[in-house]
Swiss-Prot record:
Family matches, as InterPro entries: GPCR_Rhodpsn (IPR000276), GPCR_Rhodpsn_7TM (IPR017452), Olfact_rcpt (IPR000725)
Principal location listed in the UniProt entry: membrane
This protein's GO CC annotations: plasma membrane
UniProt keyword annotation of 4Fe-4S present: no
Gene coding for it: OR1B1
Residues carrying a glycan: 6, 22
Gene source species: Homo sapiens (Human)
Compartment(s) where it occurs, according to its Swiss-Prot or TrEMBL record: Cell membrane
Identification of the protein by name: Olfactory receptor 1B1
Topology of this chain in the membrane: Multi-pass membrane protein
Phylogenetic lineage: Eukaryota, Metazoa, Chordata, Craniata, Vertebrata
PANTHER family: OLFACTORY RECEPTOR
Length: 317
């Protein structure tokens, strides 16, 4: 990452994502502070409940606990810095920190999408082969699937970093590179670059699309088989129970993959800065916020564990 050839130092990026917003920075600060604190509180509570209550020591909740940790990481990569910039009114970030944020954002973000796909596989085994569910989706296998998700994600992220490192940027009179976003993401970095970015744009579209093809295919095939299995169930109560176990996961699949496709897998000429901003807020702030509530509000096991924990706290202060 460097300035144009006649520059002698690393670029400093000026994050201008909310500079044109018709909302005061104070209001934005308290809005994102509330989102971040609620995200951390919700996901920490879910992690503690799953770890504490033996009734939640099943493969589904093991994966859900891993997803909650990832969601906290994804929010922490972007939102604390955004809050600091909203307070300072001078949202600069040096090249090294920008690259670090870029790396960790993709590491957590891609892992998030892969774990969501693994959870679809878990639901498939639970509904289509319930007698062997505990054997097939044991904790060791779940741990291996989580580890594999991290390995694939980090390899993908290293490729993205490798595409960004050779790029050059031209600074303004103050030596800053204007970045039309609220954190260091791939497309805004490309738009601000003075290098030829055609190969980068193609890599985002095709390599990223290829990476998402596997998880998307796994999710679709899992739910096709799940749907067929549900239709074969003899009782309406059994069908409702099976559908309820998948409803939360399907909600987050649509939410997460919808925003990712909206930002990263449209042809460059159809992609706008405003569209990137809105979808990125949904992906980095709203999705991690929603996950613990979507998975717990309609889940009797989680609500029961929360009630037992509160009773235990009252009895043993």
């Amino acid at each position: 990452m460097s300035f144009a050839p006649n520059a002698s130092h690393s670029p400093v990026f000026l994050l201008l994502g909310f500079s044109r917003a018709n909302i005061s920075y104070t209001l934005l600060f308290f809005l994102f502070l509330a989102i971040y604190l609620t995200t951390i509180l919700g996901n920490v509570t879910l992690v503690l409940l799953i770890s504490w209550d033996s009734r939640l020591h099943s493969p589904m909740y093991y994966l859900l606990r891993g997803l909650s940790v990832i969601d906290m990481g994804l929010s922490t990569v972007t939102l604390p810095q955004l809050l600091a910039h909203l307070v300072s009114h001078y949202p600069t970030i040096p090249a090294a920190r920008c690259l670090a944020q870029f790396f960790f954002f993709y590491a957590f973000g891609v892992t998030d999408t892969l774990v969501i796909a693994v959870m679809a596989l878990d639901r498939y085994v639970a509904i289509c082969d319930p007698l062997h569910y505990a054997l097939v989706m044991n904790h060791q296998r779940c741990a291996c699937l989580l580890a594999l998700s991290w390995v694939v994600s980090i390899l993908h992220t290293m490729l993205r970093v490798g595409l960004v490192l050779p790029l050059c940027w031209t600074g303004d009179a103050g030596g800053n590179v204007n970045l039309p976003h609220f954190f260091c993401d791939h497309r805004p970095l490309l738009r601000a670059s003075c290098s030829d970015i055609h190969s980068n744009e193609l890599a985002i579209f095709f390599e990223g699309g290829f990476l998402m093809l596997g998880p998307c295919a796994l999710i679709v095939l899992s739910y096709v088989r799940i749907g067929a299995a549900i239709l074969r169930l003899p009782s309406a109560a059994g069908r409702r129970r099976a559908v309820s176990t998948c409803g939360s996961h399907l909600t987050m699949v649509g939410f997460l993959y919808g925003t990712i496709i909206c930002v990263y897998f449209q042809p460059p000429f159809q992609n706008s800065q405003y569209q990137d901003m809105v979808a990125s807020v949904m992906y980095t702030a709203i999705t991690p916020l929603a996950n613990p509530f979507v998975y717990s509000l309609h889940n009797k096991d989680v609500k029961g564990a929360l009630c037992r924990l509160l009773e235990w706290v009252k009895v043993d202060p």
